[in-house]
């Protein structure tokens, strides 16, 4: 059920009948204020300008031609030519009844696309830290949302599993005569990494040996490949524990690291040269892009192969985009990578398109995001100024949530309390991020994110349990609610109308990669239910018809909250 699409089609038909061109836009939006109706069509203004007509005159003609049947109770013209549409409460009740019994909240079937979603992308031989959080959870929310709508989603975890660091690690492991890397945990690898880097910086012979190992690794040396694979496997096994804990849907099968594209790189460089896109410049192979200028106003050079024959991230990203089209069959590729990488990605994609590796129809989208900041407005760090490990952050979240729950429910069984602390603590961290516009930086604040008031996970989880409990207390099964939904109270109508707008919200989230829009909708929905709950008797309604209708509204609210939170990867709970 998408009311906005329905009304847009109807208003567009009326505009065309009134003389507007066939490609006119109705510009139907949800009204900002109740006095302007439920929806407002603003397209008359721009169409009137094209037709050379006074906007209000065109609006009057459109309203005369507008056939909304029983959808609207009133249509009126406001201001210079805005069309305000007031929905018919009986029609709203009928649609809510239908949505309640339909699968997937009656979301319209989509024309299925293959959507590749690039997210998380931690580095091998390093523990995940807070810098990986936003990509991981925003990308996962996108994957869940697209799948719910019916698209084929391919998750791509573009892990950093190649490069100079592996030469250092292999050389250091050999130096320590410890080739049994499978016995190491990731914390050991972090220490190894630091020691290897120290040797690399301070010992010229060691650095030379490390560089030699990189060349051997790139050349397919079996010993180096075996050691490299151990390092990758240890890291990804540890990362999988973090993904599971975060309720993130990534698995080891989704790993598509930088190394996947190695075999493609020589051919791509040769092909770009053959097409005249890449040239030799000071020993390196460079693509000069007119679309980007350097500080002297000249075309910017993008290096795709260094003097020593090594490749760069850009080369890998060119291969990556090509692979995602040719091998994965992508129609759309979403990159959840921070905003600092924007120019780099744009340059790689410009080269990809110039080379003809992908068609114009393939949408490459950088869904960039800002940084997570501390209360001081600086990048979130430990008290000593170090990087915060993701595992430590989640431990603290669960611990803080556990203490809050224990204060409110001291008699709760320990096992249930731990399970609830996990759901609330992890949910709080995720929701605090997802509820902010991804394009901006946000302040990480424990007190705000764990509050039981406001747009937070604990509040939303509590709201769900409250709604679900109404239905449980009624002691009836959904199949027993056989009477039609009838609404007489304003709060019932407002809640039902907002419930019917779920499809508008989720399609916006899917199109723009904006999970905060879903969070805002769910928070608004929870607030509307709270008002309905407080002012409308449900279980003690004055008639069986009203009782069943209000139970249906409660059930539809619970279903909608659960589906919405599921698309965000936020766990719902039965008791708070």
UniProtKB/Swiss-Prot annotation:
The keyword Ligase applies. Keywords: Aminoacyl-tRNA synthetase, ATP-binding, Cytoplasm, Ligase, Nucleotide-binding, Protein biosynthesis. It is found in: Cytoplasm. Pfam families: Arg_tRNA_synt_N, DALR_1, tRNA-synt_1d. Its EC number is 6.1.1.19. GO terms for molecular function: arginine-tRNA ligase activity; ATP binding. GO terms for biological process: arginyl-tRNA aminoacylation. A motif ('HIGH' region) lies at residues 122-132. It is an enzyme of class 6 (ligase). Its main location: cytoplasm. It catalyses: tRNA(Arg) + L-arginine + ATP = L-arginyl-tRNA(Arg) + AMP + diphosphate. GO terms for cellular component: cytoplasm. Coiled coil: none annotated. InterPro entries: aa-tRNA-synth_I_CS (IPR001412), Arg-tRNA-ligase (IPR001278), Arg-tRNA-synth_N (IPR005148), Arg-tRNA-synth_N_sf (IPR036695), ArgRS_core (IPR035684), DALR_anticod-bd (IPR008909), Rossmann-like_a/b/a_fold (IPR014729), tRNAsynth_Ia_anticodon-bd (IPR009080). Monomer. Belongs to the class-I aminoacyl-tRNA synthetase family. This is Arginine--tRNA ligase. It comes from Serratia proteamaculans (strain 568).
């Amino acid at each position: 059920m998408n009311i906005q699409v329905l009304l847009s089609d109807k208003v567009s038909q009326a505009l065309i009948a009134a003389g507007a061109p066939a490609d006119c836009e109705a510009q139907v939006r949800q009204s900002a204020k109740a006095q302007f109706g439920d929806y407002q069509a603003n397209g008359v203004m721009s169409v009137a300008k094209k037709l050379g007509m006074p906007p209000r005159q065109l609006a009057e003609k459109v309203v005369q031609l507008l056939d909304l049947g029983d959808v609207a109770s009133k249509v009126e013209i406001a201001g210079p030519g805005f069309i305000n549409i007031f929905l018919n409460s009986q029609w709203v009740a009928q649609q809510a009844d239908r949505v309640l019994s339909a699968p997937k909240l009656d979301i319209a079937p989509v024309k299925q696309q293959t959507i590749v979603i690039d997210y998380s992308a931690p580095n091998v031989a390093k523990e995940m830290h807070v810098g990986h959080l936003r990509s991981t959870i925003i990308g996962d929310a996108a994957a869940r949302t697209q799948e719910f709508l019916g698209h084929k989603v391919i998750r791509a975890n573009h892990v950093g599993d190649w490069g100079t660091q592996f030469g250092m690690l292999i050389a250091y492991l050999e130096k320590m005569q410890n080739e049994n890397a499978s016995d190491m945990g990731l914390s050991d690898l972090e220490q190894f990494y630091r020691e290897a880097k120290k040797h690399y910086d301070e010992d010229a012979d060691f650095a030379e040996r490390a560089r030699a190992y990189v060349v051997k690794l790139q050349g397919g040396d079996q010993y180096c490949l075996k050691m490299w694979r151990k390092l990758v496997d240890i890291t990804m096994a540890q990362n999988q524990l973090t993904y599971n804990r975060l309720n993130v849907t990534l698995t080891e099968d989704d790993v598509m690291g930088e190394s996947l594209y190695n075999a493609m790189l020589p051919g791509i460089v040769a092909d770009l040269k053959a097409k005249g896109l890449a040239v030799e410049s000071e020993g390196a192979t460079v693509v000069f892009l007119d679309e980007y200028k350097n500080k002297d106003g000249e075309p910017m050079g993008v290096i795709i192969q260094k003097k020593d024959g090594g490749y760069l991230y850009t080369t890998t990203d060119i291969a990556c985009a090509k692979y995602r089209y040719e091998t994965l069959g992508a129609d759309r590729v979403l990159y959840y990578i921070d905003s600092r990488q924007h120019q780099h990605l744009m340059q790689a994609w410009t080269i990809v398109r110039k080379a003809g590796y992908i068609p114009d129809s393939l949408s490459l989208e950088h869904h960039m995001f800002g940084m997570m900041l501390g209360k001081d407005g600086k990048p979130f760090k430990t008290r000593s100024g170090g990087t915060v490990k993701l595992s430590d952050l989640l431990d603290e979240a669960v611990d803080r949530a556990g203490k809050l729950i224990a204060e409110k429910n001291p008699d709760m069984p320990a096992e249930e309390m731990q399970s609830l602390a996990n759901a609330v603590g992890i949910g709080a961290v995720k929701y605090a991020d997802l509820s902010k516009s991804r394009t901006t930086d946000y302040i990480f604040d424990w007190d705000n994110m764990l509050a039981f008031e406001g747009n937070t996970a604990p509040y939303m989880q509590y709201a769900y349990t409250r709604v679900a409990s109404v239905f449980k207390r009624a002691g009836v099964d959904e199949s027993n609610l056989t009477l039609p939904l009838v609404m007489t109270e304003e709060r019932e109508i407002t809640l039902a109308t907002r419930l019917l707008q779920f499809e508008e919200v989720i399609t916006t989230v899917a199109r723009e990669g904006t999970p905060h829009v879903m969070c805002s909708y769910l928070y608004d929905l929870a607030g509307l239910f709270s008002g309905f709950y407080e002012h409308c008797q449900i279980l003690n309604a004055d008639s069986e018809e009203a009782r069943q209708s209000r139970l249906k509204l409660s059930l539809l609210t619970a279903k909608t909250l659960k589906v919405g939170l599921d698309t965000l990867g936020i766990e719902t709970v039965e008791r708070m």
